[in-house]
Amino acid sequence: MASTTLSDLPDVILSTISSLVSDSRARNSLSLVSHKFLALERSTRSHLTIRGNARDLSLVPDCFRSISHLDLSFLSPWGHTLLASLPIDHQNLLALRLKFCFPFVESLNVYTRSPSSLELLLPQWPRIRHIKLLRWHQRASQIPTGGDFVPIFEHCGGFLESLDLSNFYHWTEDLPPVLLRYADVAARLTRLDLLTASFTEGYKSSEIVSITKSCPNLKTFRVACTFDPRYFEFVGDETLSAVATSSPKLTLLHMVDTASLANPRAIPGTEAGDSAVTAGTLIEVFSGLPNLEELVLDVGKDVKHSGVALEALNSKCKKLRVLKLGQFQGVCSATEWRRLDGVALCGGLQSLSIKNSGDLTDMGLVAIGRGCCKLTTFEIQGCENVTVDGLRTMVSLRSKTLTDVRISCCKNLDTAASLKAIEPICDRIKRLHIDCVWSGSEDEEVEGRVETSEADHEEEDDGYERSQKRCKYSFEEEHCSTSDVNGFCSEDRVWEKLEYLSLWINVGEFLTPLPMTGLDDCPNLEEIRIKIEGDCRGKRRPAEPEFGLSCLALYPKLSKMQLDCGDTIGFALTAPPMQMDLSLWERFFLTGIGSLSLSELDYWPPQDRDVNQRSLSLPGAGLLQECLTLRKLFIHGTAHEHFMNFLLRIPNLRDVQLRADYYPAPENDMSTEMRVGSCSRFEDQLNSRNIID
């Protein structure tokens, strides 16, 4: 009797199985062993990202007939205008070929340096509903005002609902006239994303008012702007009121100051100044947006007495689930234990982020933990009055719901203190971000902080004791059998469900102390992101030869890494005497990476801002070639063709790409290593190899 195979399963069961497999490579593997699954996969797949060289688009198969979401932004050579290198007649033929292979496209992502590529592609799919444009290069001066957007509204006006410009560098004066010119199309837009990180000043007040008037049916609006009253046409009370009046259907609103986008870790001093946004206007805005579900206001200047407005937010926007506040003061004063105030009254929140709130105290955190009983995600940044006691209490109160915690730029919360604070959920947390700030005498510092808190805030300590009695949390008994004098567990922690870890570390520091802080047992950690930031110029040579990546080998399931040295600044060329150039720093950062069993790596090389160069060095290429298990490698910078050839020694490497996804991206191919011919030759060699599996 013949054995039963996967193909013998009924189509209904096979379809259910296929819907449970989300990983693209796993689906492709299943397609190789089952003809039924192959036919089902090809006929039902709706999302497709095309990689490979743009010159080979004619070889795209025509079996994916149900594709509705098509991403062409990662074609190689990355960052070049699609089809521009081909003769005009070939360009039209390739555009028609794409239409034939994917006839039902409704969502399109494309990298465009000029409107010519849009003029070719968009007529092929007149029923497009969503378009995402990408461009990190400077806008060409010969493009007429609004020229980047006219093809979109001209060819897709009948069905267009969503426009995403979050990764598209453009001039802010380009968009409002086009929206006015195509008023009927603008009126149908429900999603507009203008949160572009490459802006220096962002959208002006009058431009935001014009945009929201042209798009009265917006449900999602994200924009980068300037709240600083010292700037011309800054965003203040009038602008916020106009947004609420013109777009009352908003469910998602993000308004972020460009200074926060340029330097997200900045902690303003007492001289930061006040914004032109008042609590009274915020109450009016919240009243005008009753459907709001997600709100981000990162103002960059102090918003005083915001607690009253946040109390109104709870009563006016009952559907609110996600809230992020930057530079808001008085978010939760917690002056009375019996009465919750400020953001603590927003009991429906599932995600809360508080940034640079100078007057937030431990008692405020405890009140938030009591009031926001549905929190699954919590982020705190730049809150200097918060200590390990308050954060630990808040985490304990929400131990049954919290799975994602991010702690950064809090002077009283170094690495050890942060981990002690979230210890009550060490067996439940799935995603974590902390700063790697090492302390020589951690216990003494923690004890000192507690004593200082007791001396300065007796009333708050009394309230803290009452909170212990009322809440009856007993995390010590749950998580450990013995505790030290500060109430922290002395047994080893096991981070059973931790899957993603994000770390920030200052340049010149070492990663090696990380396991000794209590993060040594993470059996299910799959992905890690490490951001190294700082100025190498003037730094002494590190005492040890390596940064410490080899210490990550103790995580058995670690397979994905993002190593971001993009904000590490140094000398790309010859360094002054007694200093290290970036190639030596890159050797310091990457030494030991070959000991990790990584399958995917995103790497941002350090940069020299004076010459706008982020390039993989010879030591860097030599160390990356030691990652023998890599399958995907994306270098967010440039590299010599000779250095790229080192990577061909990685046996199973399938996908490699150079991406200058930073502003301004290198403009002239002759001044960089990212020439079309170089990239094409390397990809040809990569694709000609036999891959074992």
Swiss-Prot record:
Compartment list: Nucleus
GO-annotated biological processes: auxin polar transport; auxin-activated signaling pathway; bud dilation; cuticle development; negative regulation of seed germination; positive regulation of response to water deprivation; protein ubiquitination; regulation of meristem structural organization
LRR repeats: 9-34, 49-74, 75-100, 110-135, 141-167, 168-196, 200-225, 232-257, 274-299, 302-327, 332-356, 357-382, 383-409, 410-436, 480-505, 508-532, 541-565, 608-637
Consequence of gene disruption: Increased shoot branching.
Region (Disordered): 445-465
Predominant place of localization: nucleus
Induction or repression: Up-regulated upon binding of EIN3 to the promoter during methyl jasmonate-induced leaf senescence.
Protein name per UniProt: F-box protein MAX2
